[in-house]
Amino acid sequence: MTASLHIILDTDPGIDDAAAIAAALFAPQLDLQLITTVAGNVSVEKTTRNALQLLHFWDADVPLAQGAATPLLRPLRDAAYVHGESGMEGYDFVDHQRQPLAKPAFIAIRDVLMNAPEPMTLVAIGPLTNIALLLMHYPECACNIRRLVLMGGSAGRGNFTPNAEFNIAVDPEAAALVFRSGLEIVMCGLDVTNQAMLSPDFLNKLPALNRTGKMLHSLFNHYRSGSMRTGVRMHDLCAIAWLVRPELFTLQSCFVAVETQGEYTAGTTVVDIEGRLGQPANAQVALALDVDGFRQWVAEVFAYAP
């Protein structure tokens, strides 16, 4: 199968990010042109190191650029309590000499977009700081973005505060700018990612699959978004799944606003499912997932990896 969709992946590895990067690299329908890192699950130095380790593990020839070290206006609040102090606890990666590009992520994204023969798809599975910086410094790049597919937000409960999902809550100002930008946005939030559970039976079969399965199984043993006994949530993998298997998702066009001011609600995505605010839709919001189909696709795409 010939890869038909050229993508840029903005990420903050992160254990579930590792699974998403594997899918982005090895799904035959995708052509991963650039990886950019951002502070989120852990510091940007650690997310960059983790992404480089993964690229070396797979001997993947994909350029990588390091991005923002802090949110636009706030100090970083990370998720090391979920992913471990390094961000990818549980597997000993071998040493390597790989280095990121000598330019920041938002400039690297600009360069790839402006040199592409047609608009490209951005996939953001961390805080939206790099995407906001791109739009702030190079608004003309918006014409070269086919769509933005993101993992973030929620139409209901949060996982970082009572109402806010982690990726949006880390940098609400960046997220607010992105949702106001006019980009075509597909939002894969907690409404679907909490359904995206890999069962214990699925997880136990990973080591026999290939060396990627062994590595991911080791990481998942240290992942605190679920457990090996009850299943683990593959939040970030949903964004990649939508690119390849959109029919697995139920989407609704909605107006989405990001709260930036509330003492208790900053980072909340206000998803106007019923149209009460009278604002035009600015996102396609994923609200339901075919879980069995998702698991089948994950098994297929992991099998493509070495």
Curated annotation (Swiss-Prot):
User: Where would one find coiled-coil regions in this protein?
Assistant: none
List the GO biological process terms: purine nucleobase metabolic process; purine nucleoside catabolic process; pyrimidine nucleobase metabolic process
The UniProt keyword set, sorted, is:
Glycosidase, Hydrolase
Q: Does the keyword Nucleus apply?
A: no
Q: Which GO terms describe its cellular component?
A: cytosol
> Pfam families per the record?
IU_nuc_hydro
| Top-rank EC class of the record's enzyme | hydrolase
Give the EC number(s) under which this enzyme is classified. Answer: 3.2.-.-
Q: Where is the active site?
A: 235
The molecular function GO annotations come to: purine nucleosidase activity
Task: Name the InterPro entries on file.
Answer: Inosine/uridine_hydrolase_dom, IUNH, Nucleosid_hydro_RihC_nonspecif, Ribo_hydro-like
Give the similarity note. Answer: Belongs to the IUNH family. RihC subfamily.
Question: NCBIfam families attached here?
Answer: PRK10768.1
Describe its function.
Hydrolyzes both purine and pyrimidine ribonucleosides with a broad-substrate specificity.
What is the protein's name according to its record?
A: Non-specific ribonucleoside hydrolase RihC
Q: Which organism is it from?
A: Salmonella enteritidis PT4 (strain P125109)
Higher taxonomy: Bacteria, Pseudomonadati, Pseudomonadota, Gammaproteobacteria, Enterobacterales
